[in-house]
Structure formats: C-alpha cells, structure tokens
Amino acid sequence: MPKPRLIGTLSEKSLHAALKAYLTQPGDLIETSLDGYVIDILRGEQIIEVQTGNFSAMKRKLGKLLGAGHPVRVMYPLPVGKWIVRQTGSGELIGRRKSPTQRRPVEVFRQLVYIPHILPHPNFTLEILLTHQEEIWRDDGLGSWRRKGWSLYDHRLLDVVGQVTLTSAEDFLALLPENLPTPFTNRQLATILKITPGLAGKMTYTLRGAGWLAEAGKKGKAILFSPVNPHSSISLDAHPALE
C-alpha cells in the first residue's frame, strides 16, 4: 500500500517543484512511498517521475519499479526558451537577458545514454516537456573560477509550451533525420542534424543499446549503423533486473 509523505517541496529546487505542481491532477498521491522508493506522483497504477537532473541517478530506481510491473512515465524538461537572470549574492536583480541557445529534443540522448536498456520496456514512457525557463545566476563567490565566482543558483519554470512523447521504437527512431542514408556513420548523423559528433555518438550508442540500431560494417575507419526493424522481437531477458 503506498504511503503518502507529509514533507512536500521544502527540499526541492524551484523547477522540480513547479513541474510537479503543473503535472499533478486531483486524486494524485504526491511523494508516495512505493516498493522502497519515493514516487513524485502516483496516479492510480501510473508512476510519474519528474527528472530535472542526470538520468544515471534514477537508473536503479527505474529498473526496480519496471521490474516490479509498474508503468513508469518520466517527465524531462527541455528548455527551448531560456532567460538568464543575474542577481547579487543576496538575491537582488542585476539584469535579465534571453539566451541565444537553441535546444532540441535530440539533446535528450545526453541523458538516455545512461539507460538504453530501459527504453524498450513496454511499461516505460518518456515525455520531453518543452519549456520556457529562467536560469538564476548569483554573484556570491561560490562558483568556479571559470564562472568568475558566479554560481548557478536555480532554474525557474515559466511555461510548458509543448511535449514530445516517446513510447515505442518508432518514436525514438523518428528522432533520426528523414534524409539520413542507410547505413550511416556518426559523422553523417552529426552533419545532417547539425549536432556535435559526441552527441551523435550518444544517439547511436543509446539506440544500439535499446536494440533498435545495429552495426552494418565500416566505411573506412567509421562504423556504419542501420535501423533494426522495430517490429522484430526485443528480448528483455538480457537485462533481467533492468539495472
């Protein structure tokens, strides 16, 4: 039986707390204990986890909950619009400007690289929440020398402007560009998507780990990759504990 906790968002950062409030519906259980883990939102049998940080931190938790038969939906905020807010060490506003950085759903692979074996599980769903956020920087002397003492103090949710739901192999493979040749190299993927070779490598590593991409020889020293028929059987027995 799930056990609700009385402690709410006191220890949470603003972004996580705001997203949880945005997602919560009447009847949901918040910060409920289930199978030894604290669940952000429990909606009937559905577990909803808000993950604003590194996915490696939730790898074991996801494996245990999915292995116990629970449907899990992970909500990951991606800031497609971001404003930089600079404050004094005491929190007084210095200035605010819009960041020119453009973020895209493919960047989620920076996190998915930690959980490729989780993705094919039939009870797993990933939702990328396209958000507008403020990034709060404070001149408190606590940041690194690279930041000249400025610290990244917090993230604030301004709005959720869209979402991308990834449930099936087809959903994840659809993040590959339509004009990608078959087979293809990491460099070709990076060039067409206009991303770094490092991110392209994370994409192919993750999709291979999920069983949706296979090596198809070499082109010179570069490995060639080809999508696997998503309707072919994917064995979950290779990862019995999903850890």
Locate the predicted segments by residue.
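Acidic-basic catalytic patches of nuclease active cores, encompassing PD-(D/E)XK
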Residues: 1-38
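Conserved catalytic cores of phosphodiester-cleaving nucleases, focusing on short active-site segments
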Residues: 19, 39-54, 58, 65, ...
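Long, charge-dense
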Residues: 70-115
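Long, low-complexity, charged/polar intrinsically disordered regions in eukaryotic proteins
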Residues: 96-167
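Short acidic, hydrophobic short linear motifs in intrinsically disordered regions
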Residues: 180-192
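Short amphipathic alpha-helical interaction segments
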Residues: 195-208
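A short, conserved structural fragment
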Residues: 208-219
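Short, cationic-aromatic polyanion-contact patches
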Residues: 218-242
